[in-house]
């Protein structure tokens, strides 16, 4: 299916949101991506759609167990096989998921960054055809950010061990210039396509008023709205 057909069939949208198609096209062309898109802008579609168009496996690295579960549940509900690998699984469940992954059952696998360097996961990754790595909450790699997680620093080391370098997409909702530079450097992005979208909300505006009677102004505003 084309990207438009996948968008409609699995996600129910007729058109892409701002920035999504450019990111998808870059990933499909084999270019690394650094995308800064606000919460609710549809970052997940930016890697889920190309994941379904690539031949191999897409690993989605996420620090949040609850988010992994929600994403996998949503994908399974629309007919997309996906799994997550994190500490919420029992040992038996974890190794069963890895066995299914080796058999090619899942085009999309969510994994916690702490799992990347474990012996069992590395054994899987070194023999798997990993076509793309999507790093969610990628600002966690930067010590400039308030959500720094040392486990994110292992991502580049993990990628370096793979027999074939996959395309890498780094996604975050917010990042300063320093954090963006850290993301690109610490994840080893190669000449990435960079985009920042969605922060100009036409339905929102800021205004400053200096009324003589503040209480009347507030009272009238409440009555009006």
Language model feature labels by segment:
Residues 30-49, 59-62, 171:
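Walker A/P-loop
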Residues 58-60, 65-114, 118, 192-195:
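Conserved nucleic-acid-binding Ia/Ib motif block in the N-terminal RecA-like helicase ATPase lobe
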Residues 126-197, 215:
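Post-DEXD/H (motif II) to motif III coupling segment of the RecA-like Helicase ATP-binding lobe
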Residues 205-225:
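Conserved interdomain hinge at the start of the Helicase C-terminal
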């Amino acid at each position: 299916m084309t990207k438009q057909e996948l968008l409609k069939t699995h996600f129910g949208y007729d058109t892409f949101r701002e920035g999504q198609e450019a990111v998808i096209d870059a990933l499909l062309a084999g270019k690394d991506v650094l995308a800064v898109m606000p919460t609710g802008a549809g970052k997940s579609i930016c890697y889920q759609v190309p994941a379904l168009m690539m031949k191999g496996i897409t690993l989605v690295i996420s620090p949040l167990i609850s988010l992994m579960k929600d994403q996998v549940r949503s994908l399974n509900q629309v007919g997309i096989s996906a799994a997550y690998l994190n500490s919420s699984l029992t040992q038996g469940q974890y190794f069963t998921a890895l066995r299914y992954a080796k058999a090619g059952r899942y085009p999309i696998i969510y994994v916690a960054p702490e799992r990347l360097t474990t012996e069992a996961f590395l054994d899987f990754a070194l023999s798997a055809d990993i076509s793309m790595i999507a790093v969610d909450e990628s600002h966690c790699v930067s010590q400039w950010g308030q959500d720094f997680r040392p486990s994110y620093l292992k991502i580049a080391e993990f990628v370096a061990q793979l027999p074939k370098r996959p395309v890498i997409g780094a996604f975050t909702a917010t990042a300063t210039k320093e954090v963006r530079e850290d993301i690109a450097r610490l994840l080893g992005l190669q000449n990435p396509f960079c985009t920042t979208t969605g922060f100009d909300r036409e339905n929102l505006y800021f205004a400053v008023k200096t009324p003589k009677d503040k209480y009347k102004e507030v009272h009238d505003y409440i009555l009006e709205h």
